[in-house]
Amino acid sequence: MKTSILILAAGLGTRMKSQKPKVLQELCQKSMILHILKKAFALSDDVSVVLSHQKERVEKEILEYFPKTQILEQDLQNYPGTAGALRGFEPKNERVLILCGDMPLVEQTSLEALLSNNAKLNLAVFKARDPKSYGRVVIKNDSVEKIVEFKDANTQEKEINTCNAGVYVIDSRLLKELLPLIDNNNAAKEYYLTDIVKLAKEKDVMIKAVFVDEDEFMGINDKFELSIAENFMQEKIKKYWMQQGVIFHLPQSTFIGTDVEFMGECEVYENVRIEGKSKIINSIIKSSSVIENSIVENSDVGPLAHLRPNCELKNTHIGNFVECKNAKLNTVKAGHLSYLGDCEIDSGTNIGCGTITCNYDGVKKHKTIIGKNVFVGSDTQFIAPVKIEDEVIIAAGSTVSVNVEKGALFINRAEHKMIKDYYYKKFQK
């Protein structure tokens, strides 16, 4: 049975205390709404998002990454509440999966399990450790009797710890029939989607409660909950990679992006941060190193190294306090304290301490190309654009602003000067 998916993302998110819309708050460097959309499009090609607060800003980000998303706008003034969000929604398929835009931890497998039940109305519920302000779910004889919003719950109902996760699967025809019947006769004067359970019950529809994991289905409302969710996501990411054979030393201190890939035997030390679409292949990343959108193969990086975007390392050693950006290094040693930006360096080359590729002239970036088996002495500056042929020696302290031919020794230093007894003359000793 095909499914249409609707994501509710129109709330103000006032508890987040931010100028940025709640669903654009980032979790592991990716907006919450993007985490949800990735899973939604894996399940259906008919995905809609309901927006209101800062609609244009949220819509722009959604369509940049998921251009096939249908965008709807909720009239919060006249139709507030979760049921009000569904006005104007026209599903293309036989049933609808309704998700919340602030639930980025939900796994695709859990949604598939929810969809596997053929009841006309499925409701995701969980046993809450602390029910707080969640809506309470009353279940009798394996069927949902009703959902009571916390604001409207009596003392007895507040004691119930079975809570509404806010995720529904409903037959499209049933939704179309029941939605117009929902009113706003409640304490908040809102149109609650939870009322659809009561209406379905009145028509003797079987409502199936599907129990899910509380942590996975947590809604994120403030910065504290955002931090809890990010920690939870990081634990899952690192657990997965450790099960694939990656060694993490003090994994709780490392950050691994959702799109990072490890291949072969890899080892990651403490306080490492690997971001973006980085690929680490048979490599060791040592303490306190940062890698952004780069490929590291058969290499060791760090400690305290920084690979900025678009670096490609193969069979290379990058030591402490070395920064690379847009650099291709093949069988290279750069042991310490260097900046290698916008460059290509070939096999057998050694980069001495304090080497800099001066790649920016204030207007444009320029490239440095260094060939094979080049020895670069300490404190060398390459003024790009410049090309160093194979088997060259660059003397320490040189500033290289011209191309250097194969096999040459390049020296560029100011003539030294020594003034005898100058100290004694200056201080009259």
Curated annotation (Swiss-Prot):
Subunit structure of this chain's protein: Homotrimer.
Cofactor(s) essential for the protein: Mg(2+)
Region entry Pyrophosphorylase, spans: 1-223
Region (Linker), start-end ranges: 224-244
Catalysis performed (reactions): alpha-D-glucosamine 1-phosphate + acetyl-CoA = N-acetyl-alpha-D-glucosamine 1-phosphate + CoA + H(+); N-acetyl-alpha-D-glucosamine 1-phosphate + UTP + H(+) = UDP-N-acetyl-alpha-D-glucosamine + diphosphate
Primary localisation category: cytoplasm
Binding site for Mg(2+): D102, N221
Official protein name in the record: Bifunctional protein GlmU
Species of origin: Campylobacter jejuni subsp. jejuni serotype O:6 (strain 81116 / NCTC 11828)
Record: residues binding acetyl-CoA: N359, Y360, S378, A396, R413
E.C. number: 2.7.7.23, 2.3.1.157
GO biological process: cell morphogenesis; cell wall organization; lipid A biosynthetic process; peptidoglycan biosynthetic process; regulation of cell shape; UDP-N-acetylglucosamine biosynthetic process
Positions annotated to bind UDP-N-acetyl-alpha-D-glucosamine: 8-11, 22, 81-82, 135, 149, 164, 221, 308, 325, 339, 350
